[in-house]
């Protein structure tokens, strides 16, 4: 939800709260106590010698688009100016930059000649004064700005366009969305300076005809909290007065017409989004706010067709969508120059629903941002009445009596209780109850009780204040953070201890680095294909709705694909002998990715490629292989005192089918190890590479609770070798399992030292030789004891794997 920029007119603010401070001082005070001020801008800065001109005559220059104008700029004689604007004509008041004037980009106006005609200045558009195209009224977007008729020739133009106003740019965090309105900012400034607010009231005169005779409203979704409407008849749609256009442009909003501009004014003033419909374009007189149906669509005011889902909210008439609730109106019912009857809408929609819709459609608006963060329940209907009164005033409309409404909102203050001791302990202050009373009086909050226990009545306009800690924050802000004493904490220190998860991560990291692996950190976001490429059990993908690129669009469900990207990056830079590891998170999603957050699981992974030993005068070069990868894991498991099984698998499509094994711990798959499939390696542009990945949570759950110290025995061990003839398909793991199943307690080590297949061995068979070590920690072993052990082991091998002892 991030921060939202609110552009505050200093002139307008002073009308709402009586302050006598400079804009710079106000900005500093606000930043220190409540809301960060990004900056202050004066649109007139850098502009000079811009005056009102009255076009006395305007003649077309033959065979050109130019016009030769005589302009009264308050001098003794008219000023001749050549102008190319299509909307220049005699009788209008315009902006004139006289010779020596400075306009946007510090451009200086000089006397000149155009097509041989002398031009003593320039008739300006708003763009030439530095205003953005996005906020300039469309009727002036391709031409010059026309000033109000009452503008006096020769006067500086700044006061007529409010370019001399100071625009304070506030950065509003989600918890202070109450300041996304002029009334909210006024309350805040009044609290800071101990002033009172003064909000002008409108005199609403209603006709005898009731709104309920013209319109009916209903709610058919739990995500619509309330919906209310008024009807204004006999409206005259025209441009808004200049003061209203100036106010909107200074707030970053383009003026449209008096009806639409009134709704935007109310948005800025109350923080309450509104919409105006053309009543005569309705096919029915009943408005229903409901969830959209799959397959429905709506052409919004920007001319774009929007395909809707059941997660969207729509305003419907005759069961057809006419607006995307809380985001943007529909083109079919928009206000135009011929509109006569206007339906005004106010509502409160669920912020989460609006956020999903605007995010899915990448359609952010002033309305959607306010619904996402919250609106003041107490002024919803007041805003509706205020807008109707403004239309009565600016559009000569007749307001039907009353309003129609579906759904009710709580408007009474929210009560929060605490004590003076609670406040002082947390702030380190010695405030009195009188101090608390003064602060909450400045905030406009009600207060009852005494220092032992008091209750604060928080107005609905401050929906961010709901618990005692919020009250402490409000007290600290108004009291002054700079006045809070510096105190040391009184609580005694607590000895720190690693959690089991932290301890395991630290141990695994130490073991990995001791084995020669280098830690990397790869991106958690990858492509949808790579996200599941090496996942043993892929789940639903969690994807970004609007990714910067497809390369970083989905949360990973395995670590290996990211490691291979790192391997490829290094190999491309001539670094081919690599041993890398990473401890990070993968993201499994068993539910709906659009509704629920994924599960975050800690995994360990490594990748090795190239040589483990370089060729020198004594040794040959030695390349990595499956057994190097497995050896890393064996060392890891031995240090963790865990016993695992390796089971060959062909189920991982991106791994070599003959050199890959699943890793089982207590019969549960916790990871895999093996060679990356040659085809996959080619796709990544990497050499033969071996990888492994483990579930750290599974390792942690299986760790023995106690590590028992075993005394080093002083009695010697005895070793016996055994050579076995077996079927070629019998694995080393199966042999080890068979040997261990014999139950020989004195067996301490099993080592494979030879594997042979050749002409002396019959087809389909192989020879494997093992060295078995026996040791009694309390006594010397005898040959007879070891012989009995070997007999039991031989029997187990014969029965379980069909081994023939050679």
Curated annotation (Swiss-Prot):
It is found in: Cytoplasm. Residues 44-158 form the tRNA-binding domain. Residues 411-486 form the B5 domain. It is an enzyme of class 6 (ligase). GO terms for molecular function: ATP binding; catalytic activity, acting on a protein; magnesium ion binding; phenylalanine-tRNA ligase activity; transferase activity; tRNA binding. Keywords: Aminoacyl-tRNA synthetase, ATP-binding, Cytoplasm, Ligase, Magnesium, Metal-binding, Nucleotide-binding, Protein biosynthesis, RNA-binding, tRNA-binding. Mg(2+) binds at residues 464, 470, 473-474. Residues 713-806 form the FDX-ACB domain. This is Phenylalanine--tRNA ligase beta subunit. It comes from Streptococcus pyogenes serotype M28 (strain MGAS6180). The gene is pheT.
């Amino acid at each position: 939800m991030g921060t939202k920029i609110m552009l505050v007119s200093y002139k307008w603010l002073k009308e709402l709260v009586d302050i006598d401070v400079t804009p710079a001082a106000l900005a500093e005070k606000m930043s220190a106590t409540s809301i960060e001020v990004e900056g202050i801008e004066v649109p007139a800065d850098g502009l000079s010698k811009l005056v009102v001109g009255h076009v006395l005559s305007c003649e077309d220059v033959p065979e050109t688009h130019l016009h030769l104008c005589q302009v009264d700029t308050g001098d003794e004689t008219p000023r001749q100016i050549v102008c190319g604007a299509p909307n220049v004509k005699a009788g209008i008041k315009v902006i004139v930059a006289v010779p020596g004037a400075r306009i946007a980009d510090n451009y200086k106006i000089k006397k000149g000649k155009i097509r041989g005609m002398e031009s003593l200045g320039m008739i300006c558009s708003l763009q030439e004064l530095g205003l953005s195209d996005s906020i300039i009224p469309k009727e002036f977007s391709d031409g010059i700005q026309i000033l109000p008729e009452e503008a006096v020739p020769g006067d500086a133009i700044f006061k007529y366009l409010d370019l001399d106003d100071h625009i304070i740019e506030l950065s509003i965090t989600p918890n202070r969305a109450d300041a996304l309105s002029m009334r909210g900012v006024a309350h805040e400034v009044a609290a800071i300076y101990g002033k009172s607010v003064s909000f002008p009231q409108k005199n609403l005169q209603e006709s005898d005809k009731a709104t309920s005779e013209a319109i009916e409203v209903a709610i058919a979704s739990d995500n619509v909290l309330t919906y209310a409407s008024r009807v204004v008849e006999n409206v005259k749609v025209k441009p808004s007065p200049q003061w209203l256009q100036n106010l909107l442009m200074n707030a970053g909003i383009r003026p449209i017409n008096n009806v639409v501009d009134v709704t935007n004014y109310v948005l800025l003033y109350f923080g309450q989004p509104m919409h105006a419909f053309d009543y005569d374009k309705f096919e029915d007189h009943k408005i229903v706010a409901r969830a959209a149906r799959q397959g429905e669509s709506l052409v919004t005011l920007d001319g774009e067709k929007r395909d809707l889902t059941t997660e969207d909210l729509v305003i419907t008439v005759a069961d057809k969508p006419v607006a995307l609730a809380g985001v943007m109106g529909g083109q079919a019912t928009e206000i135009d120059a011929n509109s006569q009857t206007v339906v005004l809408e106010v509502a409160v929609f669920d912020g989460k629903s609006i956020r999903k819709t605007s995010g899915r459609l990448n359609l952010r608006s002033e309305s959607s941002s306010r619904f996402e963060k919250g609106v003041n329940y107490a002024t919803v209907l007041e805003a509706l009445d205020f807008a109707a009164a403004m239309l009565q005033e600016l559009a000569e409309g007749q307001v039907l009596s009353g309003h129609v409404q579906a759904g009710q909102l709580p408007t009474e203050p929210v009560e929060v209780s605490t004590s003076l001791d609670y406040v002082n302990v947390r702030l380190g202050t010695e405030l009195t109850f009188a101090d608390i009373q003064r602060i909450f009086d400045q905030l406009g909050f009600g207060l009852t009780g005494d220092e032992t226990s008091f209750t604060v009545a928080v107005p609905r306009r401050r929906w961010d204040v709901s618990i005692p800690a919020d009250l402490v924050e409000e007290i600290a802000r108004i009291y002054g953070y700079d006045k809070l004493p510096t105190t040391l904490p009184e609580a005694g220190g607590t000895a720190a201890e690693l959690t089991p998860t932290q301890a395991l991560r630290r141990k695994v990291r130490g073991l990995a680095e001791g084995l020669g692996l280098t830690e990397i950190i790869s991106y958690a976001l990858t492509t949808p294909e790579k996200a599941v490429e090496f996942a043993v059990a892929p789940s639903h993908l969690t994807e970004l709705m609007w990714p910067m690129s497809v390369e970083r669009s989905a949360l990973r469900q395995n670590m290996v694909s990211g490691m291979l990207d790192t391997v490829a990056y290094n190999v491309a830079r001539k670094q081919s002998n690599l041993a890398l590891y990473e401890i990070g998170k993968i993201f499994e999603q068993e539910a709906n990715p659009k509704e629920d957050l994924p599960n975050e699981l800690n995994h360990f992974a490594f990748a090795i490629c190239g040589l483990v030993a370089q060729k020198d005068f004594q040794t040959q070069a030695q390349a990595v292989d499956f057994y190097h990868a497995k050896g890393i894991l064996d060392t890891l498991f031995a240090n963790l005192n865990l016993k695992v099984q390796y089971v060959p698998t062909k189920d991982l499509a991106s791994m070599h089918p003959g050199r890959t094994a699943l890793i089982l711990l207590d019969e549960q798959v916790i990871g895999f190890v093996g060679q990356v499939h040659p085809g996959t390696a080619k796709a990544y542009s990497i050499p033969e590479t071996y990888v492994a990945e483990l579930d750290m949570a599974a390792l942690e759950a299986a760790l023995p609770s106690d590590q028992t110290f075993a005394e080093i025995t002083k009695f010697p061990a005895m070793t016996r070798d055994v050579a076995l003839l077996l079927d070629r398909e019998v694995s080393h793991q199966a042999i080890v399992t068979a040997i261990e199943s014999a139950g020989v307690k004195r067996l301490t080590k099993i080592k494979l030292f030879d594997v042979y297949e050749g002409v002396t061995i019959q087809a389909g068979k192989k020879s494997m030789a093992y060295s078995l070590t026996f040791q009694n920690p309390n006594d010397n072993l005898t040959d007879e004891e070891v012989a009995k052990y070997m007999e039991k082991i031989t029997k187990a091998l014969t029965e379980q794997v069909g081994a023939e002892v050679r």
